Amino acid sequence: SYDEKKLEKFLNNITNKKIWLDSLSCSFFYKNLLEKKNKIFNKVDPIYFLKSIKNKTEIKNMKKIHIIDGAALTKFLIWLKTNFKKTKITEISAQKKLENFRKMNPSYKYPSFSTISGTGPNGAIIHYKVSSSTNRILKKGDIYLVDSGGQYSYGTTDVTRTISLNNKSNFIKEVYTRVLKGHIAVSNFLIKKNSTGSEVDRDARKFLKKIKLDYPHGTGHGVGYFLNVHEGPQSLSKNNKVNLKNGMILSNEPGYYKKGRFGIRIENLVYINKNKFHELTVAPIEKTLIKKNILNKKEINWINNYHKRVKRDLGKFMSIKEKVALSEACSPI
């Protein structure tokens, strides 16, 4: 690394060269400095592509850590469902409780990003960060959105679940189910030779768009290995033209946000192998918000098969009471 002044001096001394520069990762100041005396070729940093393709060991370890992380998240979800009616739980206390569950594993290092812990209208703020002045109590009738992740010594996680606190709204169930349909469409997307993230993003939105709704963010981003939770160059977004390749890891996180009322997002991490997406995240998906009548047979089978795997992989980490709750959360719809 360089002291900024020394770096500026060093770059000033480069003249009459052809320089490969990635403007997405280089500041305007340094780009402008180099352009004055050199010829710039603006291309994506090739290291991005190399880093985005995970090797077999990285994939193996990511599978392992997602089971560990999924157990922590599931214990938290069971605790939350069991206790929100009988004790005061706030966005801050819920966030701390979730991290405490993660800390129980010695390989956990720290959060992979600032946890988004939002109930009711705060859940509609896409990058919400709770503070003492915005901290809300989780109340009956709310839906609670928690987007969190961990950095472990052998992997990075990022997962979102939207939880019903006895919410009965038909509109919320309709929208939630359409978000889930989009999530499943991504999971089932058949990746061809030249498939890009923009094609997948379009598939994820189509069920919301049928009722003239949408979400104002990309459907997914690349994820690093004990590195940045947001990693390029691949993403599932409208303008991303990077070809999807075996070994890439991405998030799958469609959502919907009603300002002042609620937020919905369902996020798993997936990896690409043999031209298909495969689930890394292992945690129950909220069933009480699902409107089964707008799901087709393939989607119902996806949910039931996913939950069968969740129950199988996480059961050994649960207490007797937690196993009962896990079985209920993962029972067929």
Put a short name on every predicted segment:
Residues 1-333:
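Active-site neighborhoods and metal-handling regions in enzymes and metal-associated proteins
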